[in-house]
Amino acid sequence: MSGTTAIVAFFKGNQVTVANVGDSRAIVGERKGKRIIAYSLSIDQTPYRADERERVKAAGAVVMSCDQLEGIVPFHENWGVNLGEELDNGGDPPRVWAPGKSFPGCAFTRSIGDHVAEG
């Protein structure tokens, strides 16, 4: 599976509208005294999210990490991480695989221009 992810932010006056596909992320910072607080403006579309995992599995995809696919670690779906924590989750994220294929698993559940899925 392949493709790309994207995000766009549209500013009009004091309003912002954000749209995203995949794991592209938008954040905004707010200065509070000497600190800057980051707020997420988008929600990643990845297999870390149970709703996205179930959606792609219902469409016939397989969701597992590379190590799970290769039998190095046992299969599990315990991907319960909060936004941002997945970056520190050991470097082997859950991926979406085409049924019966061992290539190329992608770490996002929605994309633009997925040639393998179109094929």
Residue ranges and their predicted role:
Residues 1-119:
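PP2C/PPM-type serine/threonine phosphatase catalytic core
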